[in-house]
């Protein structure tokens, strides 16, 4: 049996506040997650020999560090299944961009192999396997827009208004660990409630506490923010960056902004198509109401 073109959607952090730090060094966060239709796709073919094979390459990522492989082996160990899988991956979500691509791929692997192998784990059981893989992995298994607290394990579903987004990736890679270890990072933001978040339009609520550190350390990102502002777009960073996003009421408005930005860059002689040396990605995307695989798991 084979599962083809299984989606792994990107996420946006609509806001991200750092409200504390645990004794073990993990930061306590408050954030709101929303999935968008920018997605990786994975393929899973069952193997009877129990092996987990990787039919793709990720530049700079060893197989032992690959979250997809780790997720597959974690499910294997937890269930005791003797089945294996050959896994393919087509990347569209930028790596290291703050859009949760690796985490989403891992979650889709847990969900898809749970279905392919017939291991029958519930959503809560899959979420328990997800958390050790990374703080963002559980929300993709949770499968809904969520208000998150703690280190990623405390999730509450929230209903968000329809929206679209323009996602821009500056020409920079931002290591998450570097940002969280910066001495100037705000770590004592006042806590907010779900009611606080829902009382305002999502584009107006809060901030990303990681953004000032990234803007100070990475001139490619701060330059992108300034350039976009000069061209009429107020953007916010997702996660630890470097991807930026602007919210729009409808997809046609986001597409128009994409076209205007890319046209401006073409006139300046800096681009063909949708990218140029300063922006690796300029993409209009629709905000999703839920994960496309949400119904693949028994609650």
Curated annotation (Swiss-Prot):
GO biological process, one term: terpenoid biosynthetic process
UniProt keyword annotations, A-Z: ATP-binding, Isoprene biosynthesis, Kinase, Nucleotide-binding, Transferase
Keyword ATP-binding annotated: yes
Protein's UniProt keywords contain Endoplasmic reticulum: no
GO molecular function: 4-(cytidine 5'-diphospho)-2-C-methyl-D-erythritol kinase activity; ATP binding
Stored InterPro entries: GHMP_kinase_C_dom, GHMP_kinase_C_sf, GHMP_kinase_N_dom, IspE, Ribosomal_Su5_D2-typ_SF, Ribsml_uS5_D2-typ_fold_subgr
Pathway(s) of this molecule: Isoprenoid biosynthesis; isopentenyl diphosphate biosynthesis via DXP pathway; isopentenyl diphosphate from 1-deoxy-D-xylulose 5-phosphate: step 3/6
Active-site residue list: 11, 136
Catalytic activity: 4-CDP-2-C-methyl-D-erythritol + ATP = 4-CDP-2-C-methyl-D-erythritol 2-phosphate + ADP + H(+)
Record-linked SUPFAM superfamilies: GHMP Kinase, C-terminal domain (SSF55060), Ribosomal protein S5 domain 2-like (SSF54211)
Superkingdom of origin: Bacteria
EC number per UniProt: 2.7.1.148
Broad enzyme group: transferase
Positions bound to ATP: 94-104
Any Pfam family the entry gives: GHMP_kinases_C
Family label: Belongs to the GHMP kinase family. IspE subfamily.
Record-linked HAMAP family: IspE
UniProt function note: Catalyzes the phosphorylation of the position 2 hydroxy group of 4-diphosphocytidyl-2C-methyl-D-erythritol.
Protein name, per record: 4-diphosphocytidyl-2-C-methyl-D-erythritol kinase
Naturally occurring in which organism (per UniProt): Bordetella pertussis (strain Tohama I / ATCC BAA-589 / NCTC 13251)
